[in-house]
Design a protein with these regions (language model features):
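Short beta-edge strand/loop motif at the mouth of beta-sheet-based domains
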Residues: 38-42
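A short, hydrophobic beta-strand-centered structural micro-motif
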Residues: 43-50
Length: 152
């Protein structure tokens, strides 16, 4: 029986679900967390692939890779300052959580992703901002970059 290889994006989603901020919102609202598909619900999450050359450096033994992933969230939207502050605060706290996890080297588990991938870091490359808004909700996005080593 062959071993099932898990996509890197699935490992990143599993890691993000360990963030207390996301876990609390999912528990409180029942928010879905999809891969490449943000629903129109008032609160929902999605992680998506971003195009680009993933190879940073080529070595004799393998490659240093980097993949960019937009993290999207559907959130309540209003002209009321309290709602805007809450949305901004969510992404600020998420950015800080990612930075702390990187500093502690608590990175996504890529062991089930095949190819001997070893994570080396994760960073937020664009902070959270509104992409679109309509009818009481908005789509916000934050960009992350996962770096890892993959042997040949």
């Amino acid at each position: 029986m062959s071993e099932t290889v898990k996509p890197t994006i699935a490992a990143l989603r599993a890691w993000l679900k360990t963030c207390p901020l996301i876990a609390d919102e999912q528990e409180a609202t029942g928010a879905a967390f999809r891969i490449a598909g943000l629903e129109e619900e008032s609160t929902a999450f999605s992680i998506e692939d971003s195009p680009g050359d993933p190879i940073i450096t080529k070595y004799i033994s393998g490659w240093e890779m980097a993949k960019n992933y937009p993290f999207l969230s559907r959130r309540e939207y209003s002209e009321v300052d309290a709602v805007s502050i809450q949305n901004s605060g969510f992404f600020e706290q998420l950015t800080e959580w990612v930075m702390r996890q990187d500093a502690r080297h608590n990175l996504p588990d890529l062991s089930a992703c095949g190819g001997g991938k070893t994570p080396t870091g994760i960073a937020v490359t664009n902070s959270g901002y509104i992409v679109t808004n309509s009818a009481g909700s908005c789509k916000m996005q934050l960009q992350m970059c996962l770096t890892y080593y993959m042997p040949k």
